[in-house]
């Protein structure tokens, strides 16, 4: 099923028992995060807090708190179907011309989906039913959550930030946390390699001292939200990919105060600019690592206009030690990564980012090993092929007889097939998430690759061990009599 807007999606979730409305008064200060955390950890539903303490606007949390709801948001029934999306992205990343008529016919479904990529611009949109400007702009009237006791201030966590560089035709959508520091001021925390930060950097070089236009959409339709967190090719717009997910063009409308296009059905849109000369100290905040992060200076987003739907819904989340919503998203989107990696490295059988690895910091890869040194090539490929794995600290490579998603299997492979001196690869002075305080320098640290594969001639001078295998005839015989044994 496809959803035109967030409200359609919520109606579907409620019909499936995947959304609960809470009518009791709940405080956005700490209480909503505590309730959301407990609900997510038990695999519970999305939550609509209808009576936030001190506010009139309802708050939506835990929307993508299970892999099933992530898949539903992408128009699929379960996460296994997300591999088909990964195949489509792999095709779009490096399309190959058909080698014959039969192959051309086989590619027609993919090209048909591409027809849904261009967005549709509306002159009148629901997201602009209410328009606030000037002194009417008051961010403190939004029920922005304060998630952890040690957090410095309330935090906008699910805003889709829309930017455009001076030399790019496409607009970029990214999700960056934004600290509330004034009635019309937010701190825009974006890492230097992210699309919004790159657009801003190019703008500053091309337009010194001129304000950089920014719009932030809160509560967009699920396809657009998820497009912003999916590893799409750099040349593809998130709006275009949302159209592919939805099976129909993404509807957008021009912002009131700038030329940026925003999701037409968004619940709330913040419009404004970033002054290249204005920064503020951001944090500390409890983050997806399970720790409070260090403080750092980031640009300040000045909000000049707020537009919204009548009876708008504020969409929010919290981050903390896994599992949290980003970890669940990472677990589901793991299935999207696999076909993209396999297109470049066909020897990869499976690829897994364990949620407890803070979404992306550790990866387990299983391969059909073909030559000595193969595991190291795959390590280097994972670190370099997709920008999403720039910050992955640990890559463990195993043979295809190991289940990448079973820690018992992976640990067995490491302890029996790996010599620490020979089979660990250390790389110094590589990019690391600045939130990773374990690195000696903020933003710069090391990576480790672990080769837990069986060793080939040239990799060892010893005779390699032969794994124990059960006699299939005995296994079959015991299967037949098992129920009679009373065990």
Swiss-Prot record:
Any one GO cellular component localisation term in the record: plasma membrane
Enzyme class (EC, first level): lyase
Pathway noted in the entry: Cofactor biosynthesis; ubiquinone biosynthesis
The record's free-text note on cofactor binding: Binds 1 prenylated FMN per subunit.
Residues that, per the record, bind Mn(2+): 172, 238
UniProt catalytic activity: a 4-hydroxy-3-(all-trans-polyprenyl)benzoate + H(+) = a 2-(all-trans-polyprenyl)phenol + CO2
Membrane association type: Peripheral membrane protein
Record-level Gene Ontology MF annotations: 3-octaprenyl-4-hydroxybenzoate carboxy-lyase activity; metal ion binding
Assembly with partners or alone: Homohexamer.
Protein's name according to its UniProt entry: 3-octaprenyl-4-hydroxybenzoate carboxy-lyase
Organism: Actinobacillus pleuropneumoniae serotype 5b (strain L20)
Gene, per the UniProt record: ubiD
